[in-house]
From Swiss-Prot:
Chain positions recorded as GTP binding sites: 355-362, 402-406, 456-459
Lineage, highest ranks first: Bacteria, Pseudomonadati, Pseudomonadota, Alphaproteobacteria, Rickettsiales
Main location: cytoplasm
Encoding gene, per UniProt annotation: infB
Described purpose of this protein according to its UniProt entry: One of the essential components for the initiation of protein synthesis. Protects formylmethionyl-tRNA from spontaneous hydrolysis and promotes its binding to the 30S ribosomal subunits. Also involved in the hydrolysis of GTP during the formation of the 70S ribosomal complex.
Organism name: Ehrlichia canis (strain Jake)
Highest taxon of the lineage: Bacteria
UniProt KW Protein biosynthesis keyword: yes
Region G2: start-end pairs: 380-384
Keyword field: Cytoplasm, GTP-binding, Initiation factor, Nucleotide-binding, Protein biosynthesis
Cited PROSITE patterns: G_TR_2, IF2
Designated name of the protein: Translation initiation factor IF-2
Region called G3, residue ranges: 402-405
Stretches for region G1: 355-362
Chain segments carrying region G4: 456-459
Gene Ontology MF annotations: GTP binding; GTPase activity; translation initiation factor activity
Length: 848
């Protein structure tokens, strides 16, 4: 026994938490839930409270006293079974031990609480209090008094936990609360309640034991009762452990919720912001914001409805957040003015090739680039705008922009002149000055850029260079040969004649212009072309005008598109990490297809990108509303009749084609019919397009895009017309044809005969029966007639019955008599009345 006591003392002094000498696990086990709860608290602990040394010494004294009891019990055991303690003596001893433990526990909890308050400040502390289960293990009588007393010592050690030197404290972010004091009270109350429950169980067991002792049953032993009591005790332990864990989880969830509710955010508020955006910026639910607006009197508010800055500020303050009013216009100005004070460095010239359709612009570029783009164009006509960069000797670079020459691509040519430094005007030597040539000259003058004239196809026998220069003079373009400043270079793209001279002229012009740009700043530039690729998504061709564009930058394009640059490719299709000024690149990563000619700029973050997009979208919507209002006012002034409408859904391969076709068909106007483009977009025809066309009674115009088999089948079922085109000429001509078929023909009345009235046979409600003589032309049954008296039309009608003698006939020629029936019941005067026979001729109208 002394060896056991020494082992206990050494274990306590060394700080170990396990007592293999006392065999705790043999009699009473902590439930798995308590162990998990303890591990959870230890892992999440923030601060550590050391157990006072006085407490450790007191616990050692308690164990020593228990050891003395153990020694005394062993004395009883040595005397034999006749000296075994009675049940009443065991109950009295256990009650005394429990009362002592309760008194000691109160002092320990009070001391621990004092230490916690001194060590942990401004934090909520939750102590890992040992589970108090005053189990009367004396009742587990299996092998004698020695084992019963051993269980008493084991329970005392578990309750007091003398070797637990570190109690972990969970710090909650909401600050201290009243859980510390409450835990102390709850621990004592639980201990007292547990004691009362166990006393009742002991009394019940004592009564049953006395009854069994007085009338014992065969086969029933004390061992069976001990197992029963042990099972009841373990069930009570498990229930209490579950309750403790549930209380801890509830307290944790409540703590996390309160922390979240107390987070204060700084919200940026523009001039206008939607309800959904405001809720997102505050990290609040949209429903909560709607409820707040409902209380303010805003009923039927939707997530996409706009709020002004004043309303948004009130909402932010109501949710205990702070706000800052921002001017997005100033933000955009600051972005574009960033880096203007940095050093300017030379850059490559941007050259736009312009001219009339089929004058050899793309072929000339192919000859310069030594490529073959023209053969890839349908029917040799450029349908898209393209950007390329070539490297000459000495690492000199020239960026070329190829624009379509068809009249429909006016917007593209205007876009080309806005980003260019030099314009190469291509004029065919055999055709001379053409309409799009004149238009290109006007664009150059409006943009105030330098121009070089390239007279192409000089290898033809009918080429006349002097005629070209004189024709240019009529449009204000004076060649150097005539004393002007415009360089005229005769070239042949087919035979590659004078191409080096054209390159040299471009480089010379670039040196005279002293083209420079800032490299070390945020990138900005212009969109040349954009489209949707089935493999890559949105692809936009950009030209950097300022700064350096890098892969990974976040850019804002126009009023509807932004994104992170996932990848860039140069004009040769190679991956590009950076793009410097004057370099054209294809960019992947935008969320929407931007319009050609839209500007782009690099921003710091996606949040800033969304703010800038919202501001630009607000301006764009305001302009649309203004235009719609002006159109409505104009229609009210005209007060025109309702006209027929042709609804169109336009799908193209690139955004430039969309704009060009919209521009072209907008010029097709007629007073009796109206053309509406309900939807325009980039990409293949989809099922949504077909359903929209069915609902709106529209036709689908597909330019250089396809429709898969499922879409075609759906269109056939819904009777939706899908027209495919590859050349812009065809789509414009087809739209004119469709519009012409919708026009009502013009009706014109032509006199084809005349009748002289010889006799009136009868006149009444059924009509008038007249005997007539055909003086001219031919009279047919059902012909339109006019009854004229003194040069005044008194009746218009049709010939119901036409007869010769008694026979019905279809027509009567000039010089013959006939009888007719008119639906006219008033009096007719044969002497003065005449009848003119008319025929209605319809004239089909065609939109040109």
């Amino acid at each position: 026994m002394n060896e056991s006591k020494g082992a206990v003392d050494s274990g306590l002094m060394s700080g170990k938490t396990e007592r293999t000498t006392l065999k705790l696990s043999d009699k009473l086990k902590l439930s798995s839930s308590i162990q998990q709860n303890t591990k959870f608290a230890l892992n999440k602990s923030i601060t550590t409270v050391e157990v006072r040394k006085s407490k450790k010494r007191r616990d050692i004294d308690n164990i020593e006293q228990a050891s003395v009891v153990l020694q005394n019990d062993n004395v009883y055991q040595s005397d034999g079974d006749n000296n075994t303690l009675t049940i009443q003596e065991q109950i009295s001893r256990m009650n005394a031990l429990q009362n002592a433990n309760i008194h000691e526990k109160k002092e320990e909890v009070s001391d621990d609480q004092t230490d916690k308050k001194e060590e942990v400040t401004n934090a909520e502390t939750v102590g890992l209090l040992p589970v108090e289960e005053n189990v009367n293990t004396d009742l587990v009588i299996e092998e004698g008094h020695s084992e019963k007393v051993e269980e008493v010592i084991e329970e005392s050690v578990i309750e007091d936990q003398p070797n637990l030197e570190h109690l972990d404290v969970i710090e909650e972010k909401n600050g201290p609360n009243q859980s510390g004091d409450q835990n102390v009270d709850n621990s004592i109350v639980d201990l007292l309640q547990s004691k009362a429950v166990e006393e009742k169980k002991l009394k019940k067991y004592e009564k049953e034991h006395e009854e069994k002792k007085g009338n014992p049953k065969k086969g029933v032993s004390n061992h069976m009762y001990s197992k029963h009591v042990k099972l009841v005790i373990e069930e009570e332990l498990e229930d209490n452990n579950k309750q403790i864990i549930q209380t801890h989880k509830t307290r944790k969830n409540r703590s996390v919720s309160s922390i979240k509710n107390k987070i204060t955010r700084k919200v940026l508020i523009p001039k206008k912001i939607t309800v959904q955006e405001l809720a997102s910026n505050m990290s609040e639910r949209v429903k909560d914001v709607q409820n707040m607006l409902f209380q303010m009197g805003r009923r039927d508010i939707k997530p996409n409805d706009f709020l002004d800055s004043d309303q948004a500020a009130i909402i932010v303050e109501a949710f205990n957040h702070t706000f800052k009013l921002v001017n997005d216009g100033k933000l955009e100005d600051d972005l574009y003015s960033d880096g203007n004070d940095k050093e300017l460095l030379p850059r490559a010239p941007v050259v736009t090739v312009m001219g009339h359709v089929d004058h050899g612009k793309t072929s000339l570029l192919d000859a310069i680039r030594e490529s073959n783009v023209a053969d890839g164009e349908f029917k040799g006509i450029t349908q898209h705008i393209g950007a390329y960069q070539i490297i000459l000797d000495g690492d000199k670079r020239i960026t070329f922009i190829d624009t379509p020459g068809h009249e429909a691509f006016t917007a593209m040519r205007a876009c080309g002149t806005n980003v260019t430094d030099i314009v190469v005007l291509v004029v065919a030597a055999d055709d001379g000055i053409m309409p799009q040539t004149i238009e290109s000259i006007n664009h150059v003058k409006a943009a105030n850029v330098a121009m070089i004239v390239a007279v192409n196809k000089i290898d033809k026998h009918d080429a006349n260079l002097d005629k070209i220069t004189n024709s240019l003079l009529n449009h204000g373009v004076v060649a150097e040969s005539l004393g002007g400043d415009v360089i005229v270079v005769p070239v042949s793209a087919k035979e590659k004649i004078n191409l080096d001279q054209l390159k040299s002229s471009i480089l010379l012009m670039a040196e005279l212009l002293e083209l420079k740009a800032i490299y070390n700043t945020r990138a900005s530039g212009v969109v040349i072309e954009s489209k949707i690729d089935k493999n890559c998504g949105v692809v936009a061709t950009l030209i950097v005008q300022k700064g350096t564009l890098k892969s990974g930058d976040i850019i804002v394009v126009g009023h509807n598109s932004y994104g992170k640059v996932r990848n860039m490719f140069n004009s040769d299709g190679r991956s590009q990490k950076v793009a410097i000024p004057s370099m054209p690149v294809k960019v992947l990563g935008l969320n929407n297809v931007p319009n050609s000619g839209s500007s782009f700029i690099v921003v710091d973050s996606e949040k800033q990108a969304r703010e800038l997009i919202n501001y630009r979208q607000e301006l764009f919507n305001a302009s649309l509303e203004e235009n719609a209002k002006s159109k409505m006012d104009a229609s009210n002034i005209l007060a025109c009749d309702v006209v027929d409408e042709l609804n169109v859904i336009l799908k193209c391969d690139v955004m430039g084609s969309v704009e060009a076709i919209c521009y072209s068909i907008s010029k097709i106007t007629h007073e009796d019919i109206k053309l509406n483009v309900l939807y325009k977009g980039v990409g293949n025809v989809t099922k949504s397009d077909v359903l929209l066309a069915e609902t709106s009674n529209s036709i689908i115009l597909a330019f250089n895009v396809k429709a898969d088999a499922q879409v075609k089948e759906l269109a056939k079922q819904r009777c939706v017309e899908i027209n495919h085109y590859s050349v812009i000429y065809d789509i414009i001509d087809d739209v004119k044809r469709i519009l012409s078929s919708m026009l009502k023909p013009l009706q014109q009345e032509v006199q084809v005969g005349a009748l002289a009235i010889r006799k009136v046979f009868s006149s009444g409600n059924a009509g008038s029966v007249l005997g007539c003589y055909v003086t001219s032309g031919v009279v047919k049954k059902g012909s339109l007639v006019k009854l004229i008296r003194n040069n005044t039309i008194i009746h218009e009608g049709k010939i119901k019955v036409l007869r010769r003698f008694k026979d019905d006939v279809k027509e009567v020629s000039s010089g013959f008599e006939c009888g007719i029936l008119l639906d006219y019941s008033k009096e007719i005067y044969p002497e003065s009345d005449i009848i003119n026979v008319l025929e209605v001729i319809e004239e089909v109208r065609v939109i040109k």
